[in-house]
């Protein structure tokens, strides 16, 4: 049965094994186009130690996929990966994390990824750090944190606080606009991947269409890029993606995604002052985006059938 409580538990605190993490990463943009290739040596050096890690970057830089890769390349790959999303923790969820005997903080020999620590209040950050230290969580597990920095700004103070207290190593994920020279290769590799998942084939993209993509600001970075290119590929009725199609999509995108909006890394908290149907649909949409549009994995994570998922999306 689909319930808010069950769904929130699956989204806020998630446990995954190696095979599930491999599946998630292999279908991600980072894996498909090799975005972490430039950071390979940095990641290898980080994994030579058991020090806590702080992953940071702008919104939409797919930090969770970078953490998946970090986990898979580490000596902890055969133990569970636990993901705690601070942004989706309500009062009960926070109390569970801090006080419950089954809290992830009571685990041992796990990789624990606590994401979006920058959305916590100062008191919450202090409580979390105090519990981690008092319970030796960092000595019994591999700890990874993440935070979001604003455009062209350094790590936020919340992230710096954790880095200093926990002696974290840091992994910075550059924004998409810093890879403009690699844009044609990234687009074409992703289109090749999409061709394996669609019933039609897209041969490529017009030169002017590529220039328009390169000039776009991409405020939500890779998560926005992946969604837009996938939409262009699925909607085109021609062998190539045209400049007109790109212009239309980007114009619409600019009107609904303002610069500075928080992307996949920090979703807006659930508004519970709505009907049950509206809240359920919001949860489904968030999970669908996390699963890169894969309806089968979304239904499995939410504990519902694909038919139920389809009906909830349609309503």
What are these regions (language model features)?
Residues 59-63, 68, 123-127, 151-153, ...:
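Bacterial C-terminal helix-turn-helix
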Residues 118, 203, 216, 270, ...:
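Helix-turn-helix-type domain boundary/helix-start signal
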